[in-house]
Amino acid sequence: MSQSFNRHRRLRTSKAMREMVKETRLHPSDFIYPIFVVEGLEGKKAVPSMPDVHHVSLDLLKDEVAELVKLGIQSVIVFGIPEEKDDCGTQAYHDHGIVQKAITEIKEHFPEMVVVADTCLCEYTDHGHCGLVKDGVILNDESLELLAQTAVSQAKAGADIIAPSNMMDGFVTVIREALDKEGFVNIPIMSYAVKYSSEFYGPFRDAANSTPQFGDRKTYQMDPANRMEALREAQSDVEEGADFLIVKPSLSYMDIMRDVKNEFTLPLVAYNVSGEYSMVKAAAQNGWIKEKEIVLEILTSMKRAGADLIITYHAKDAAKWLAE
């Protein structure tokens, strides 16, 4: 038989051999776990559209984070659901808002936990949009000041990282200036630089009670059909002072992740969003897929595509599986 071909299978002959030449590895420290803290809630409450994800009360937050620490997960991103909402999202930037209280609670008990604060208005506005609204139009420049106030209040509460997710033009510049003015020059910005207008966000909007009450978010979030626009968005945020770049969603946007990783040297964060999570959970519950294998394959693929960190609701399960 001719020996002119390459025998690639030599490096696949055993589990040990495959492990030796593995190019991409997952570790619990790669994961950022999202937590939904609800004002006025007693105990925990399941999110129906996101199996195994819960709303958590402030008094149970310590136990929730303690579990993450035991699993080796070193970072959380905090979302808050207030009791009261208004057209200006006042509770987003209130010094005693639910997210501010949650951040302080986590840092008091777990000072080494890296707390990322989601900086947006949609969970706090009665209309569900990420900025101020006038005559049905989401106002850009007028919303920036409120976002800056939100970021500063979160930093004062103890946030390690500010993560603005609103997709208003200029948000990184305004937030950076506000943080620096208040003395928070060492607080990094994890920018939702590339955030598409996606139907994969559906379960999250249930969890965060942030579904728009009119229209959609297509005037400020990106068109899923666009690729080059992602690089323009990322470039703007790099120039404005971002320290991390997020691509959201990620499972259907790995080409975008690779483009961004190839173009920029900042740490890249993949957001493995709620719809991606819930599809896997639903299929696994029906016995159509092997959940463990699918989840680890998806997360590995995101890292292979260029992600340095992954925001994922699978974090706890994945950390347990990686420890087996």
Curated annotation (Swiss-Prot):
EC number, as in UniProt? 4.2.1.24
**Classification via PROSITE patterns:** D_ALA_DEHYDRATASE (PS00169)
Q: Which residues form the signal peptide?
A: none
Annotated residues for binding of 5-aminolevulinate 1: 205, 217
Alphabetically list the UniProt keywords. Heme biosynthesis, Lyase, Magnesium, Metal-binding, Porphyrin biosynthesis, Zinc
Q: Which cofactor does it need?
A: Zn(2+)
Question: What does the record list as GO biological process?
Answer: heme biosynthetic process; protoporphyrinogen IX biosynthetic process
Q: Where does Zn(2+) bind?
A: 120, 122, 130
Q: State the family named in the UniProt similarity comment for this chain.
A: Belongs to the ALAD family.
- PANTHER family for the chain: DELTA-AMINOLEVULINIC ACID DEHYDRATASE
Name of the protein: Delta-aminolevulinic acid dehydratase
Q: What is the lineage of its organism?
A: Bacteria, Bacillati, Bacillota, Bacilli, Bacillales
